[in-house]
From Swiss-Prot:
EC category name: oxidoreductase
Molecular-function GO terms, alphabetical: 4 iron, 4 sulfur cluster binding; 4-hydroxy-3-methylbut-2-en-1-yl diphosphate synthase activity (ferredoxin); 4-hydroxy-3-methylbut-2-enyl-diphosphate synthase activity (flavodoxin); iron ion binding
Family note: Belongs to the IspG family.
Keyword Magnesium annotated: no
Organism field: Vibrio vulnificus (strain YJ016)
Keywords, ordered alphabetically: 4Fe-4S, Iron, Iron-sulfur, Isoprene biosynthesis, Metal-binding, Oxidoreductase
Protein name as annotated: 4-hydroxy-3-methylbut-2-en-1-yl diphosphate synthase (flavodoxin)
Enzyme Commission designation: 1.17.7.3
Chain's role: Converts 2C-methyl-D-erythritol 2,4-cyclodiphosphate (ME-2,4cPP) into 1-hydroxy-2-methyl-2-(E)-butenyl 4-diphosphate.
A Pfam family of this chain: GcpE
Listed InterPro entries: Dihydropteroate_synth-like_sf (IPR011005), IspG_bac (IPR016425), IspG_bac-typ (IPR004588), NO2/SO3_Rdtase_4Fe4S_sf (IPR045854)
UniProt-listed PANTHER family: 4-HYDROXY-3-METHYLBUT-2-EN-1-YL DIPHOSPHATE SYNTHASE, 4-HYDROXY-3-METHYLBUT-2-EN-1-YL DIPHOSPHATE SYNTHASE (FERREDOXIN), CHLOROPLASTIC
Amino acid sequence: MHNESPIIRRKSTRIYVGDVPIGDGAPIAVQSMTNTRTTDVAATVAQIKALENVGADIVRVSVPTMDAAEAFKLIKQQVSIPLVADIHFDYRIALKVAEYGVDCLRINPGNIGNEERIRSVVDCARDKNIPIRIGVNGGSLEKDLQMKYGEPTPEALVESAMRHVDILDRLNFDQFKVSVKASDVFLAVDSYRLLAKKIDQPLHLGITEAGGARAGAVKSAVGLGMLLAEGIGDTLRISLAANPVEEIKVGFDILKSLRIRSRGINFIACPSCSRQEFDVISTVNALEERLEDIITPMDVSIIGCVVNGPGEAEVSHLGLAGSNKKSAFYEDGKRQKERFDNEDLVNQLEAKIRAKAARMDESNRIDIKVQN
């Protein structure tokens, strides 16, 4: 029930990764990347489907060898979500996966080779209507840029990106997006800010190699939050040393926090104190686990006492304000006559949330696909 985001997004051009629009005001797409052996087709397909189930719009798959390219062909046949092939070193792998229906090619300027090889990839992408991501990374800059700047700097990352933007411009290819990732928050943020002033293409955001599930989520939230709040970013990937499913959850949580794009329930819950009339923490944990399948955007406040409980409930779709033995229940900001037994809050509130979701959105789906 909170207002729309006040953020004014940067204007950018539009490309499509499969049927998912990127840029020009399209919903910010949330991506992840498989961490299975690509040659293990069954495991990779299973992970892609798990990512799709938690809301991934696009999935990137590493294709390091020709054997992996042949496996990619089989993987693509078994999934419906758009796939990006992550290509390093050997441009011929990009040409091969293009034959197998890849939806986007990610190439790294630091290791893909000379302009002639890039031309071969671009010509193939143009013929098959495949977009490209120029993916610059602070850990793999070209050697001459390492020598010139001494260390990764925003200017170095952006110069690397612009070299390849210029190549694509000369080849009259405009179906691309760009990323300038770094593991340092300020380096990444300053690089994206600088790049955003130079080009109109969509920007893919990420803090690369951010760390484990907790630290990586915090680092990504800080860095990407700064950029998104400034309107920079058209698609994102949270890089965690964790189950890729967590990357999607964190990505949506960041977008949800900024009211840019909502998926599922936004739980507003107090950290609890001695005033709580029920166990807030266990209640929230249980509901989060039970209701992962609900993707209809909804604010649900769960507050353990009457200090802030009524106020939060009045601006939520559903709300609970703790009281002795039975807690007050709110819907659409209005207190209901019905009260919930504090010993059975999880079951009662789950039923109310599911019923509310069904009324708000019968299909319980969010469609990122928008019209031109």
